[in-house]
Amino acid sequence: MEYVYMMGFLAALLMALGLTPLVKRFAVRVGAVDAPNQRKVHTRIMPRLGGLAIYLAFIGAFLVALPLMEGYKPHVIWGLLLGATIVTIVGALDDRFDLSPKVKLLGQMLASGVVVAFGVKVDFVTLPFGDGTQMGWLSIPITIFWIVGVTNAINLIDGLDGLAAGVSAIATGTIFVLSLLMGNVTVALLSAVLLGSILGFLFFNFHPAKIFMGDSGALFLGFSLATLSVLGFKQATLVSFVVPIFILGVPLSDTFFAIVRRTLNRTPISAADKNHLHHCLLALGLGHRNSVLVIYGIAAMFATSAVLLSTVAQWVALIVIAVTLLILQVGAEMIGIVQKGKRPVISFVQRLLSLKQSERM
């Protein structure tokens, strides 16, 4: 079975390498370009629509590998492919015509509804040290909310060359590893093919980028990752609920901090700003490439935690969760991603240390 995964991965990688230059020329020809402005980091007009190359490589390679596959679930596959096609079309139209947020949201909800209609749902949740809970009819809105939320979270971090693609590749690789451990052949093949298509595109998208993925890429990757995470972790365990959140830790935490920041500043949650994780790292003077590499490292930390959560005892999993969240909070305070100058956890630790020093004296 392993050769099928490898074949799908290599086919997607080669297709993405071949398709991306063609999509780049097509984007310029149809006027799907991204002009620099106050919020953006790039300083010259860049072609968008890179997501089309990722999508086409994914579809093409998957169709090549699928006939060699055994034990897959066809309804799940076609639900994912149909939903992914919808969001990619919506994203491509936005790359060219700048659709309104309401239209894009409607397209995302439609794609999510298609996946749910094909039977992909979050229908079981387990709480720590408790019994599992069947979600019943709530599984439908919860699944749609999850898919739409992750889709937009990937879109939010797409602010530096190679950032969204690299973080998505790390998340996809993690899903692939965990799906192998759990014996989920359908998710393993889908994630192997998706990983190959992302890496092939990343060759052209890493700094200095020759093409942007655009909304066609961000929406496709976010939708695919959200759906794969639902497919891969439906077991009745504590970590089945937490693992997908950790796999997508970078985009989800950045989105969470953005919501908190805008709430504290009394600005609309949908209002754009330059205080996302990559903006904060740039402000520290790390530079474009180093900022991206640091975020790759954070994504790898979340990925490692996700794998540990799936392989250790429950009490160890709770410790891993607590330590990871503590590191995340301290890091957020150090770079000022929520509010500059406010460091509650760091200040608390400093007060404890000063008290201990005074007691010794």
Task: Give a label for each model feature.
Residues 58, 197, 284-306:
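Hydrophobic membrane-spanning alpha-helices of multi-pass integral membrane proteins
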Residues 1-255:
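"…together with the soluble PPM/PP2C metallo-phosphatase catalytic core" -> "…together
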Residues 231-237, 323-340:
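N-terminal hydrophobic signal/anchor transmembrane helix of membrane proteins
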Residues 303-322:
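Extracellular/periplasmic helix-loop-helix junctions in multi-pass membrane proteins
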Residues 21-46, 257-289, 355-359:
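Cytosolic, membrane-interface loops and tails of multi-pass inner-membrane proteins
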Residues 341-359:
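Short, highly charged, low-complexity non-transmembrane loops/tails of multi-pass membrane proteins
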Residues 22-26, 331-347:
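Membrane-interface capping segments at transmembrane-helix boundaries
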